[in-house]
Swiss-Prot record:
DNA-dependent RNA polymerase catalyzes the transcription of DNA into RNA using the four ribonucleoside triphosphates as substrates. One of its GO terms (cellular component) is DNA-directed RNA polymerase complex. The keyword Nucleotidyltransferase applies. It comes from Histophilus somni (strain 129Pt) (Haemophilus somnus). This is DNA-directed RNA polymerase subunit beta. PANTHER family: DNA-DIRECTED RNA POLYMERASE I SUBUNIT 2. Coiled coil: none annotated.
Length: 1342
């Protein structure tokens, strides 16, 4: 494999045996692609904004004289970039302008001649844009729109599994679900009548729907039944015989023909009998007259002389009727063919309970059910029914729905109209009846072929369409009002409803969520999340067990491991690594095609629907050099997802990768295959809660997924183009782009500004640190700067800790951990947390609030950290209760007398009419002020601090641009210099001239002169561009801010807190092995090995066997081996050994095992080998891919190479006594994470605080500065001990005895320690409650 310069700095050795066939795809595709489809112009108008516009426009007025047509749309450029929007608290959005055409026609002209056309661009609100990382910035905060897994539109056949009716009878039902519009359900009741429901309302006999579709009784029976015809001949009754229909029946009379008895009476009819009848070609058989009694007529029989109906369709035939029919001259009588087994009389029975008799009565019934209480008219009833399923405005199956509908009914063509047709409804009823008759299967709702993904773009389009529909109504009204001479499209359209609908979706939809920004992994996972909840989805209370369960079709599409614990389990899932959505929104996963037992290079994506037809081999099947299966039988997933053994020639496809099944977070767990699923789930979830540490440390034992996650998360800076590093400092990297990658006529310089110490959504710290050095060559797509939790472009969520599995004095009881003080000293788990506190000055009724340092009744000490504007200075160390921003609010309770007004006017006594409402540091918080921002409303005078900040920003912006210009100029003048030197000038001449004069020289060579003139033009362009950019920056910085109504000024203060690890903090490994730190032990007390090296963490060995997460033990062993090799390399470097020896040793380590990754160090220069060795000193990074990891023998070999015992166990000594422990202990390196559950955020103690209004008891919870609840059971405990006085104190003065507690407070302050409890307030409450019941209750004093 060829490594680039940066990749050679540190190579992760992989134990993966299978070569990588398909690279891990870009992980945020699902978000970015979906949104791109939404905003790009789709020429077919099938999706996105274009589709929404085309579905609503043209809007025609009610009289048809005018129409508003849609021409095209365009999105503007956002005013502020993403970073500026976050700082200012605005939405990152672009304005939408739509070109509309208002056409008016002549009233009298029948042909519709056009009278007038007005075309105009209309503003239609703002559309939030997606950032390059798949997020949205809404009101300054980053949000993610989670994709939804919802039931695909189409038709579904289901049964109640015998749960509805007490008899346990299985009732079948069918449901037609459109993308938008009314649902239509068909269902059987326990009496086997077929009913229909519209929108889950009251049920109606299903035949009402058929009658409303204009079918007569005769046509209905014709659609659903086969006929049996009887002939009356010579007073005999002959029945046309279809032998196949007789199977399984019992003959109720002798079946004979031509004098031969084929079947005797009372005998069961078998296949042998049928064969005999078919052989002799018997087509008619004589039946006794009684046989026809009870059969049902298939059509109306009319008396031809009188026109009177003798026997209507669907009537049971009796002997009298038969007599009448034969008298009327009917020789042939048709009846319905039914039997109890597989041709039930359901529709015929339903027609009997159907109250309607023709189309109109059916429509009236439907109208009454949909609009109870309204008087039906013929027009209204027809209009309602047509609009329900046959109007494209109200009903749309969508392309997906039509495809699923046709597939379900076995129709070849998967395209068609978005509305239903008569045939569609009849076909659904037919299939439902077939299923009831035992032919066909019900659908599996949880199959991923019946559930589809609805992503951001689609949801945004739906919201946008809702907004457009609201506008459409208003436009229609306006068009109908007449007087359209002076009206322009701009006057007709109000953008408010549109922007309100879009804003509502992005701001408050259940699926638009505050981004989880703990670390890069949590960001990536959040964007790849798939939720079954949300509008149009399930609710967690109603979701049963089946929906939440892992389904066979999840394989390679949805991760079976990663899902939250708790009420949402199984409803929120994560996309598998390689999964993607197809055009219809169904999840697909890639497979390698197999032809005749030979695996090809071809890769195909299959959806769950297609996958069911094939046999698919697993990724770990053994292949030979020619990619043929070596085993006679291969474990595969066959039809319907059942696994079994198949011959190689029966196999159609093979998995692409062993990681195909799991999601990104689960693919980061090494030795996942050795962990119990429940613990793996916790491990995957807890990695998302890891807080980025001060110094990121790559995992010694990884899985190879660390790099793609870090790159795709967007937290690191990636090179846009290759080149050389020209300048680097903590906040900026400049790259001189390679000649072949520059565009003609540009300077070829890329400047990357880094993000420094900013706050994430979870209050963790986002900071980028350069990881390249001056002069280094880089390639496109390489990492230039590490973000939070990344180390040399690899995800690094925690730290590698030396752990020992052994009990230690009970300090690791029940998952606690004993941590060495060295971990604290080295700041291994120190994290930075940044909090934003804001102070808002509003305009109140009594006057405006003011931000000032002049605060009434506050001592000098409290103001010591404020500047003259009343705002805290940067760098101040503050603690709970300190003032950050001084603010006073006018108070105006008192009406002043004229005398007082005069005095106040003379002496300017101001303190009395304002109250202090300053922003203070919340209790329990302390930290350093790292940044202050002041936002002032347009037209309000800026204070001194705001001007200072503005000045600083202008300086910084100018400095940035000047530096950029200098770098670009240097590049340009370098080219000018080369040109002049080649054109006859020498160095000395050029040095005597000013650089700008170089451009004025003339060269003899015409070609070179032209080049020089071009460069001079470029120089001018650069200067102009610089001025222009500076002006834009300046206007952005100087302009007032767009604040909420009534807000004059906002001051935001950022506090940074450095949190070291301490007892009570929660830590975890990657295998679901979580615990709380019980004690931080001095280094000298920790167990140490014979080299005197102490361990960092002592874990409890009893936490492993019962939890069955053995992966952590294997990780520990492999980590020890990795460290051992690092130690060996370190020793060789320290001894200054020969580079060749070093190269040999490292090569040996990379070659160990039979992995597919080959590292050839012979192509590395000595310098590169040394750099690599230096980076491997702390341990050699290893990768053990999921389900394809290191084997035990490889771990042992690696331990041996590192000069360590192959058992992975070491003799330890007690740090306090120096004695040996009685048996060897498993010691190694485990990757530990510090989770965002810090004791500082949870611990809390109340002094005197606020009380609840009604009960007067202290509030609860840290946020309310509440107390600890002394509940019912605690009271019982004190009662049991007979601690009467303690109990009395608890129930009165410490709780809700108002007078008692004030008295007590005074006593304590006064130094007298006595209490006299009074009546608790809650006693008064109960008295009031009893009085409210009308019972008078009084307390009599004795």
């Amino acid at each position: 494999m060829v490594y680039s310069y940066t990749e050679k700095k540190r190579i992760r050795k992989s134990f993966g045996k299978r070569p990588q066939v398909l690279n891990v795809p870009y992980l945020l595709t699902i978000q970015l692609d979906s949104f791109d489809k939404f905003i790009q112009r789709d020429p077919d108008g099938q999706q996105g904004l274009e589709a929404a516009f085309r579905s609503i426009f043209p809007i025609v007025s009610n009289n048809g004289n005018t129409e508003l047509q849609y021409v095209s749309y365009q999105l503007g450029e956002p005013v502020f970039d993403v970073r500026e929007c976050q700082i200012r608290g605005t939405t990152y959005a672009a304005s939408l302008r739509v070109k509309l055409r208002l056409v008016s026609y002549d009233k009298d002209a029948a042909s519709g001649t056009i009278k007038d056309i007005k075309e105009q661009e209309v503003y239609m609100g703002e559309i939030p844009l997606m950032t390059s990382n798949g997020t949205f910035v809404i009101n300054g905060t980053e949000r993610v729109v989670v994709s939804q897994l919802h039931r695909s539109p189409g038709v579904f056949f289901d049964s109640d599994k015998g749960k509805t009716h007490s008899s346990g009878k299985v009732l079948y039902n069918a449901r037609i679900i459109p993308y938008r519009g009314s649902w239509l359900d068909f269902e059987f009741d326990p009496k086997d009548n077929l009913y229909a429901r519209i929108d889950r309302r009251r049920k109606l006999p299903a035949t009402i729907i058929l009658r409303a579709l204009n079918y007569t009784t005769e046509e209905i029976l014709d659609l659903f039944f086969d006929k049996v015809s009887f002939e009356i001949k010579d007073n005999k009754l002959l029945m046309t015989l279809v032998p196949e229909r007789l199977r399984g029946e019992t003959a109720s009379f002798d079946i004979e023909a031509n004098g031969k008895v084929y079947i005797e009476r009372g005998r069961r009819i078998t296949a042998r009998h049928i064969k005999a009848l078919e052989k002799d070609k018997i087509t008619q058989v004589e039946v006794p007259t009684e046989y026809i009694v009870g059969k049902v007529s298939a059509k109306d029989y009319v008396d031809l002389t009188t026109g009177e109906i003798i026997c209507p369709a669907n009537m049971e035939i009796s002997l009298e009727l038969l007599e009448k029919l034969s008298q009327a001259g009917y020789k042939n009588i048709e009846t319905l063919f039914t039997n109890d087994l597989d041709f039930g009389p359901y529709i015929s029975e339903t027609l009997r309970v159907d109250p309607s008799y023709d189309r109109l009565s059916a429509l009236v019934e439907i109208y009454r059910m949909m609009r109870p209480g309204e008087p039906p008219t013929k027009e209204a009833a027809e209009g309602l029914f047509d609009n329900l399923f046959f109007s494209s405005e109200r009903y749309d199956l969508s392309a997906v729905g039509r495809m699923k509908f046709n597939r379900s009914l076995g129709i070849e063509d998967t395209t068609g109209s978005g509305t239903l047709s008569k045939e569609d409804i009849v076909n659904v009823m037919r299939k439902l009846i077939d299923i009831r008759n035992g032919r066909g299967e019900v659908d599996d709702i949880d199959h991923l072929g019946n559930r589809r993904i609805r992503s951001v773009g689609e949801m945004a389009e739906n919201q946008f369409r809702i907004g457009l529909v609201r506008v459409e109504r208003a436009v229609k009204e306006r068009l109908s009002l007449g007087d359209l001479e002076s009206v322009t499209p701009q006057d007709l359209i109000n953008a408010k409803p549109i922007s309100a609908a879009v804003k509502e979706f992005f701001g408050s939809s259940q699926l638009s969520q505050f981004m989880d920004q703990n670390n890069p992994l949590s960001e990536v996972t959040h964007k790849r999340r798939i939720s079954a909840l949300g509008p149009g989805g399930l609710t967690r209370e109603r979701a049963g067990f089946e929906v939440r369960d892992v389904h066979a079709t999840h394989y390679g599409r949805v991760c079976p491991i990663e899902t939250p614990e708790g009420p949402n389990i199984g409803l929120i899932n994560s996309l598998s690594v390689y999964a993607r959505t197809n055009d219809y929104g169904f999840l697909e996963t890639p497979y390698r095609k197999v032809v005749n037992g030979q695996v090809t290079e071809e890769i195909e994506y299959l959806s769950a629907i297609e996958e069911g037809k094939y046999v698919i081999a697993q990724a770990n099947s053994n292949l030979d050099g020619e990619l043929r299966f070596t085993d006679a039988f291969v474990t595969c997933r066959g039809e319907h997802g059942e696994s079994g053994l198949y011959r190689p020639e029966e196999i159609h496809y093979m998995d692409v990768s062993t990681q195909q099944v799991v999601s990104v977070a689960a693919a980061l767990i090494p030795f996942l295959e050795h962990d119990d699923a429940n613990r793996a789930l916790m491990g995957a979830n807890m990695q998302r809660q890891a807080v980025p540490t001060l110094r990121a440390d790559k995992p010694l034992v990884g899985t190879g997924m660390e790099k793609p996650v870090a790159l795709d998360s967007g937290v690191a800076v990636v090179a846009k183009r290759g080149g050389t590093i020209q300048y680097v400092d903590a906040s900026r990297i400049v790259v001189k782009v390679n000649e072949d990658e520059t565009i003609a006529g540009e300077a070829g310089i890329d400047i990357y500004n880094l993000i420094k110490y900013t706050r994430s959504n979870q209050n963790t710290c986002i900071n980028q640190i350069p990881c390249v050095q001056l002069g280094e060559p880089i390639e496109r797509g390489e990492i230039l700067a590490d973000g939070p939790s990344t180390d040399l472009g690899e995800l690094a969520l925690g730290q590698n800790m030396r752990v020992a599995f052994m009990p230690w004095n009970g300090y690791n009881f029940e998952d606690s951990m004993l941590v060495s003080e060295r971990v604290v000293q080295e700041d291994r788990f120190t994290t930075i947390h940044i909090q934003e506190l804001s102070c808002v000055a509003r305009d109140t009724k009594l006057g405006s609030e003011e931000i000032t340092a002049d605060i009434p009744n506050v001592g000098e000490a409290a103001l010591s950290k404020l500047d003259e504007s009343g705002i805290v200075y940067i760098g101040a160390e503050v603690k709970g209760g300190d003032i950050l921003v001084g603010k006073v609010t006018p108070k105006g309770e008192t009406q002043l007398t004229p005398e007082e007004k005069l005095l106040r006017a003379i002496f300017g006594e101001k303190a009395s009419d304002v109250k202090d409402s300053s922003l203070r540091v919340p209790n329990g918080t302390s930290g350093t002020v790292i940044d202050v921002q002041v936002f002032t409303r347009d037209g309000v005078e800026k204070d001194k601090r705001a001007l200072e900040i503005e000045e600083m920003q202008l300086k910084q912006a100018k400095k940035d641009l000047v530096e950029e210009l200098e770098i670009l100029e240097a590049g340009l003048f370098a080219r000018v210099r080369n040109l002049l030197l080649s054109g006859g000038f020498n160095d000395k001449q050029l040095e005597n001239l000013d650089r700008t004069q170089w451009l004025e020289q003339t060269l003899v060579d015409e070609d070179k002169q032209n080049q020089l003139e071009q460069l001079a033009e470029q120089y001018e362009e650069l200067r102009k561009d610089f001025e222009h950019k500076l002006e834009i920056k300046r206007s952005k910085i100087i302009q007032g801010d767009d604040l909420a109504p009534g807000v004059l000024k906002v001051v935001k203060v950022y506090l940074a807190v450095k949190r070291q690890i301490q007892p009570g903090d929660k830590m975890a490994g990657r295998h679901g092995n979580k615990g709380v730190i019980s004690k931080i032990n001095p280094v000298e007390d920790m167990p140490y090995d014979e080299n005197g090296q102490p361990v960092d963490i002592v874990l409890n060995p009893l936490g492993v066997p019962s939890r069955m997460n053995i992966g952590q033990i294997l990780e520990t062993h492999l980590g020890l081996a990795a460290k051992g090799i690092g130690d060996q390399i370190n020793a060789m470097i320290k001894q200054k050994q020969d580079v060749e020896k070093l190269r040999g040793y490292i090569q040996k380590a990379y070659d160990l095992g039979d992995g597919s990754q080959k590292v050839d160090l012979s192509t590395f220069t000595d310098e590169e080998v040394l750099r690599l060795a230096k980076n491997l000193r702390k341990g050699m990074p290893l990768a053990t891919p999921v389900f394809d990891g290191a084997h035990e023998k490889e771990i042992k070999a690696l331990l041996e190479l590192g000069g360590l015992p192959t058992s992975g166990q070491i003799t330890l000594f007690d740090g306090r006594t120096g004695e040996k422990f009685e048996r060897p202990v498993t010691v190694g390196y485990m990757y530990m994470l510090k989770l965002n559950h810090l004791v500082d955020d949870k611990m809390h103690a109340r002094s005197t605080g606020s009380y609840s209004l009604v009960t007067q008891q202290p509030l609860g919870g840290k946020a309310q500065f509440g107390g600890q609840r002394f509940g019912e059971m605690e009271v019982w405990a004190l009662e049991a001990y007979g601690a009467a006085y303690t109990l009395q104190e608890m129930l009165t003065v410490k709780s809700d005895d108002v007078n008692g507690r004030t008295k007590m407070y005074k006593n304590i302050v006064g130094g007298t320690h006595q209490m006299d409890p009074g009546t608790p307030e809650s006693f008064n409450v109960i008295m009031k409650e009893i009085r409210s019941l009308g019972i008078n209750i009084d307390l009599d004093e004795e």
